[in-house]
C-alpha cells in the first residue's frame, strides 16, 4: 500500500542501520529541518550505476537532522544518512560512503529555490489546510521535487492516504511514509532554474493538483479548513527572517512531526 523499507521505504526500530554519511546543508534547506528530515526518492534520483552501488541499503528516511542544543533556523545544519547493510566496516559499505556523501552534497544544493523564491511557499500554502502542507523544494537533475507533509487525525488517516494516492499517478508524484512524517512529493519537469515565469506556472499547477487532492479527501468526509493557519504563518515568518536577515529561531520550537508515522497507521 505505502512504500516500505529499502530503496523506497522508511527506517524503523526493527531495521538494522548505521550512520554512513554526514553533510552540512545551507540554510535554504532549513524548511525541511522543521520536519527533522529530507526524504530522498532514491529510485527516482539515482543513476543506474549509483543504484548498483547503493543496492537496497537506503530508505526514504533520507537525510535526518542532527539535533543539538542550539539548532537555529539561521544556521547551516548537519544532516545524516543511514545505511542498512549488516557490516559498517565492510569494503562495500566504506566505498559507498564517499559516493553517497558527494551525492548528498549535490542534492541539498538543489534547495536554493527555497530562499531565492520565498513567495513560492506563501503562494502554495495560501488558504490551504495544515493537513496538506507544502514544506519545500529540491531542484535536482532537471526535476523539481515539491514536498508536502501530510497529517490527518488517526481515525481518518488511512482513508485520507488512500484518497490522495488515487489522485497521484507515478509520473505525477509519490505518497509514502518516512521516518518522522508522511509525505506527498510532486515532480515537475518543466521548471527552469532561471525562469521565473516557469516557476510561477509550476506554483499554479501545484495548487490545482492540491485542489484535486482536497476534493477527493473531502469525499470521505473530512472537514478541512481552507485557511492559512497561524502556525504556518509563524513558520513562514521565521523562515523569511532567518534566510533574509539571519534572525535565530530554535528549530525545536517550530518543528513538525507526525505521530502517525511512529504508530504505523
UniProtKB/Swiss-Prot annotation:
Keyword Acetylation among UniProt keywords: no
Principal subcellular localisation of the protein: host cell
Domain of life: Viruses
GO terms under cellular component: host cell cytoplasm; host cell nucleus
Pfam families, per database record: Adeno_E4_34 (PF04528)
Subcellular localization, as worded in the UniProt entry: Host nucleus; Host cytoplasm
Keyword Hydrolase among UniProt keywords: no
Keywords linked to the UniProt accession: Early protein, Host cytoplasm, Host nucleus
Family of this protein: Belongs to the adenoviridae E4 30 to 34 kDa protein family.
Quaternary structure, from the entry: Interacts with E1B-55k.
Function per UniProt: Plays a major role to prevent cellular inhibition of viral genome replication by nuclear bodies. Assembles an SCF-like E3 ubiquitin ligase complex based on the cellular proteins ELOB, ELOC, CUL5 and RBX1, in cooperation with viral E1B-55K. This viral RING-type ligase ubiquitinates cellular substrates prior to proteasomal degradation: p53/TP53, LIG4, MRE11-RAD50-NBS1 (MRN) complex, ITGA3, DAXX and BLM.
The protein's name: Early E4 31 kDa protein
